[in-house]
């Protein structure tokens, strides 16, 4: 049976379980778009290709499936770069399909020709330029397999226009599934023996737990052993914030109890965490006087940032189950007494105004089917500190790259991935201005995202860092001229309101929840608000910066 390359592309996407793609057309990808008309796959036309990449990312994070974004050659493809880098650093399975100029024109500086495979090599798990029509089917199959198996990540497939139009003898190609990597039994036994002897153990859960769908296995292990649990920014949701074993987020803006527990621990069981600099602070003090057991699917991560006493590479579920069988509970009451003497997640750290808005949302959202997406900056840290996330894939944020503008398009993708849920995008005014045009996409497709914009007329985290590190020499941290984001949303036909008190925000979210349509809420806050606790730059994770109240508000 002969099919055009474009028809094969649509067929493979459908067979791989793709129901929705996010994209923006252009000349080099038009044959694919022509074939897509006859396909059952839903196409969402975004306002910008970066929005398409973030939406595919949000779709993947919310569903656990591969997200797909489409762009044409040249500027269309390069506009995907930030989104692909975001997915790469957070290990998100995304397949990006880009059009390319005809094969005979490649290397001749043709109109809208760029070497997108060369550009994206450092920020994709793998990428392909399809040079022969007969390679199209196996390449697409391999792209999906690579994106989702092992450590997930983005894969780009660059398809020349004449490959899309070529008639190809279609042959079904199915790749053998990769078998889960079993953990080394001797290392598991050594880890279990160390856990059994530890007097001050802590489990650290990272984003790898959620990527592996291993959150229940991690929970069963920590409950059996009654071990305190802390999470990285990306691990939020792996263990419910309402569980007594959960101490909070650790890191440079981590909870005091969580950071102190990590500092005082004699053993850290790290599950799916990269130990990046935002988690560890000063590295030598982080690992001093403790044994670190590091579980990860990717051997390249073990001992990369922190030397582990015991490193175990393998399937996360299999490794956690093996540890649960081998490790035994023992008396940790004195350790828990010490932990409970430190300030907890609900204790205030300074005279902060902004966290009250986030705390006010918890009673409204508890036990509801919701997803939170964020941009990057102060609001992201306040949300991570004060929202009580209950489940995996309920918290979607850009942790590795720290991409401003991620939240709104990611919310679009997440809402389409899980229509039964309600997605709430939380942004600052700076990040929202970067991708706020995706309100067009949300409105035109009636996607019921609730967008909350915290407006301090500036770049709050930059202001905070300039306060701490540059003696209040404020530069380029103000966004002069008030923008009324409620009126901006109204221009797209989206209803909204202002909520300048925590109770008003809670009421506005409850109101928006009841109407199954897009809604925007603007919250104006004092630009002097600080994210606290804050670890002093270059110091250990329990070396907190102290502020006087007049510096905070």
Region annotations inferred by a language model:
Residues 1-327, 364, 448-451, 468-471, ...:
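N-terminal alpha/beta PP-like core and its mobile active-site loop of ThDP/TPP-dependent enzymes
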Residues 9, 14, 27, 32, ...:
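Active-site diphosphate/adenylate-binding microenvironment
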Residues 24-26, 44-54, 69-76, 131-132, ...:
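Active-site nucleophile and cofactor-binding loops and adjacent substrate-binding regions
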Residues 112, 444-536:
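Thiamine diphosphate
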Residues 134, 170, 192-193, 289-376, ...:
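Phosphate/pyrophosphate-binding active-site segments
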Residues 276-278, 381, 528-530:
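Short glycine-rich, flexible loops that bind phosphorylated cofactors or substrates
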Residues 292, 361, 374, 413, ...:
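Hydrophobic, well-ordered secondary-structure elements that form the walls
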Residues 406, 410-448, 454:
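Catalytic phosphate/nucleotide-handling subdomain of diverse soluble enzymes
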């Amino acid at each position: 049976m002969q099919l055009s390359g474009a028809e094969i592309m649509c067929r493979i996407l459908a067979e791989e379980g793709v129901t929705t793609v996010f994209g923006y057309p252009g000349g080099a990808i038009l044959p694919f778009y022509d074939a897509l008309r006859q396909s059952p796959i839903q196409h969402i036309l975004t306002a910008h290709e970066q929005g398409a990449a973030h939406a595919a990312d949000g779709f993947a994070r919310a569903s656990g499936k591969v997200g797909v974004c489409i762009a044409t050659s040249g500027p269309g493809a390069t506009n995907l770069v930030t989104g692909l880098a975001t997915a790469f650093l957070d290990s998100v399975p995304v397949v990006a399909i880009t059009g390319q100029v005809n094969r005979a024109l490649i290397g001749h500086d043709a109109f809208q020709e760029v070497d997108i495979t060369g550009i994206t090599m450092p920020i994709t798990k793998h990428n392909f330029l399809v040079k022969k029509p007969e390679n199209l089917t196996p390449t697409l199959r391999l792209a999906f397999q690579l994106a989702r198996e092992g450590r997930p990540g983005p894969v780009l497939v660059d398809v020349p226009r004449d490959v899309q139009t070529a008639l190809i003898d279609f042959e079904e190609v199915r790749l053998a599934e990769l078998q889960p990597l079993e953990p080394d039994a001797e290392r598991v036994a050594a880890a279990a023996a160390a856990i059994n002897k530890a007097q001050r153990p802590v489990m650290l859960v990272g984003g790898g737990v959620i990527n592996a769908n291993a959150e229940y296995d991690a929970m069963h292990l920590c409950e059996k052993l009654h071990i305190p649990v802390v999470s990285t920014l990306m691990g939020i949701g792996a263990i419910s914030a309402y569980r007594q074993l959960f101490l909070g987020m650790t890191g440079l803006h981590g909870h005091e109890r969580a950071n102190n527990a990590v500092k005082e621990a004699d053993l850290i069981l790290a599950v799916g965490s990269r130990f990046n600099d935002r988690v560890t602070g000063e590295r030598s003090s982080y690992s001093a006087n403790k044994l670190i057991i590091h579980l990860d699917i990717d051997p390249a991560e073990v001992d990369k940032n922190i030397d582990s006493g015991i490193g175990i590479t393998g399937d996360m579920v299999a490794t956690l189950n093996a540890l649960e069988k081998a490790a035994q509970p023992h008396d940790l009451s004195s350790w828990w007494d010490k932990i409970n003497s430190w300030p907890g997640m609900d204790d205030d750290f300074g005279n902060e105004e902004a966290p009250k808005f986030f705390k006010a949302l918890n009673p409204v959202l508890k036990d509801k089917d919701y997803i939170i997406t964020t941009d990057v900056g102060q609001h992201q840290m306040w949300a991570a500190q004060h929202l009580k996330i209950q489940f995996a894939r309920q918290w979607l944020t850009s942790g590795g790259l720290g991409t401003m503008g991620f939240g709104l398009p990611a919310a679009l993708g997440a809402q389409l991935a899980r229509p039964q849920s309600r997605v709430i995008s939380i942004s600052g005014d700076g990040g929202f201005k970067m991708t706020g045009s995706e309100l067009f996409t949300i409105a035109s497709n009636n996607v019921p995202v609730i967008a909350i914009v915290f407006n301090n007329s500036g770049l709050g985290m930059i202001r905070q860092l300039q306060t701490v590190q540059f003696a209040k020499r404020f530069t380029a941290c103000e966004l002069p001229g008030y923008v009324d984001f409620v009126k901006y949303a109204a221009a797209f036909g989206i209803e909204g309101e202002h909520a300048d008190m925590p109770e008003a925000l809670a009421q506005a979210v409850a109101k928006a929840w009841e109407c199954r349509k897009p809604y925007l809420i603007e919250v104006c806050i004092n630009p002097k608000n600080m994210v606290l606790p804050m670890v002093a730059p270059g110091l250990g994770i329990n070396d907190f910066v102290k502020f006087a109240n007049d510096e905070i508000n």
